[in-house]
Amino acid sequence: METYMDTLNQLSTICFGHGDGFGINTNILETNIINLSVVIGVVVSFGGDALRSLLDNRKETILANLQEADLRAKEAQEKLAAARLQLEQAQTKAQEIRQQGTITAEQEKQLCIKQAEADMARLEDVKQQTLRLQQQRAMSQVSQQVIALALQKVRQKLQDAANSAFHTSVNNSNIAFFTKYKV
């Protein structure tokens, strides 16, 4: 680094002189064109390499940033496509769930209607059986009352007719009946 500074000091001394100050020398022979060309060559060679290096680094940085931006854009496009696909799948799934819910509700409705109809038919059967049972009980009670009344009337008649004349007449008719069947 010191050699570079020494070289630069020597070049400035050669080009600008010692204390004359900075100014434009219009005399071509005094300006030492060779020294100027050397200084310009050194500046261009050192500065050019540094400038070229800076420009190359900047170019590589810009290219890397562009590649990274392209990669991010591709990733964003892929994520967007995946999100759209997921949205379509979710919408399809939601539609299927709505349709399935409608179908299930209709099935439940039909099942409830059938069950209500079956319950009504069963209740109608129970009602008819109850009516038949009540009719049978009523008929049984009426029959028992008729029989009891008939027996009561027969007893009454037997008691009324149980006098001795009736017994004599029944006994005589039974004797006559058995005498016909002598063996």
UniProtKB/Swiss-Prot annotation:
Entry keyword Signal: no
Keywords, sorted A to Z: ATP synthesis, CF(0), Chloroplast, Hydrogen ion transport, Ion transport, Membrane, Plastid, Thylakoid, Transmembrane, Transmembrane helix, Transport
One of the record's GO molecular function terms: proton-transporting ATP synthase activity, rotational mechanism
Keyword Coiled coil part of the UniProt annotation: no
Chief location category: plastid
Parts of the chain that traverse the membrane: 33-51
Localization terms from the record: Plastid, Chloroplast thylakoid membrane
Membrane topology type: Single-pass membrane protein
Self-association and partners: F-type ATPases have 2 components, F(1) - the catalytic core - and F(0) - the membrane proton channel. F(1) has five subunits: alpha(3), beta(3), gamma(1), delta(1), epsilon(1). F(0) has four main subunits: a(1), b(1), b'(1) and c(10-14). The alpha and beta chains form an alternating ring which encloses part of the gamma chain. F(1) is attached to F(0) by a central stalk formed by the gamma and epsilon chains, while a peripheral stalk is formed by the delta, b and b' chains.
Family: Belongs to the ATPase B chain family.
Additional comment: In plastids the F-type ATPase is also known as CF(1)CF(0).
Protein name per the record: ATP synthase subunit b, chloroplastic
Upper lineage: Eukaryota, Viridiplantae, Chlorophyta, Ulvophyceae, Oltmannsiellopsidales
Protein encoded by which gene: atpF
